[in-house]
């Protein structure tokens, strides 16, 4: 699961693949599920609606310290994601980012039951089991709430940066006050004609070091900061963005603008999962607690999206849930085989895959 195995929505061709298990959600629990699938000798593919693995940990609080992961006194959320990526990298399972799982169709034949899963990017998967590790649901960006914004989306208005080259030599306005907004403002100032960061208040929800670097860059004349909110977007008759109006304490200012990047954060919603025929309660999927299987046999749920009595929303709980779920999923993928438990320290085959040797 190196970067080479991570494909985004801009990949040229949709993927068609047969796999033992499809993991929906590439946050920490989904990444550990991939590792567990590898331990069990199962084939696996992960899909995620976000443009990179890590889920909430990467998108919402990458610098947040975590203190309750076994054997780690402390680590940041991003460090945890990086460690999980490294752990499952030897299995080289593909992570398909920027695409949302849309439909789950049951396929029945003389050989048993399988599922046909399609995504928003046109991918089609034939799998023996589906494991939903979607956290609080599919994340979507908070959009610019101006009537003229919709027509500019995808052309000059962006909610993520996928290709820095398109901003080379452009006048770029970045709206937002979190880590992503500051990180991209600092990065793009090196290639854009001019970068202006716009935020509604002086305080930021970002790492102190990033805030300090941004303020130093403003003082040095490398970029601009404007206090206020987007109030209007100006464009030519053919739909080319030319300006962004900012309303601040002293009235309205129009910034010359070729490209607008709005990084207001993400909102979560169950998304298409509500149509997958699994029992849900208060936006979460109910599961039984022997294998965390949903009301639809062969479809499992783990992590924050799973609901059962005395459920604890902890990452370590999700790790346990996927370990149990995959052992039942193994039966569906290999109905003629018996899964024999082997301790990892005695599993020579696993050690070879992980490129380690027992002492």
Swiss-Prot record:
Protein name in UniProt: Ferredoxin--NADP reductase
Protein EC: 1.18.1.2
Any Pfam family the entry gives: Pyr_redox_2
InterPro entries: FAD/NAD-bd_sf, FAD/NAD-binding_dom, Fd--NADP_Rdtase_type_2, Ferredoxin-NADP_redctase_2
Cited Gene3D superfamilies: FAD/NAD(P)-binding domain
Sorted UniProt keywords: FAD, Flavoprotein, NADP, Oxidoreductase
Family per record: Belongs to the ferredoxin--NADP reductase type 2 family.
Organism: Ralstonia pickettii (strain 12J)
MF terms in GO: ferredoxin-NADP+ reductase activity; flavin adenine dinucleotide binding; NADP binding
Sites where the protein binds FAD: 48, 56, 61, 101, 139, 304, 345
Note accompanying the cofactor annotation: Binds 1 FAD per subunit.
Cofactor: FAD
Record has Magnesium as a keyword: no
Domain of life: Bacteria
Subunit structure: Homodimer.
Catalyzed reaction equations: 2 reduced [2Fe-2S]-[ferredoxin] + NADP(+) + H(+) = 2 oxidized [2Fe-2S]-[ferredoxin] + NADPH
Enzyme class: oxidoreductase
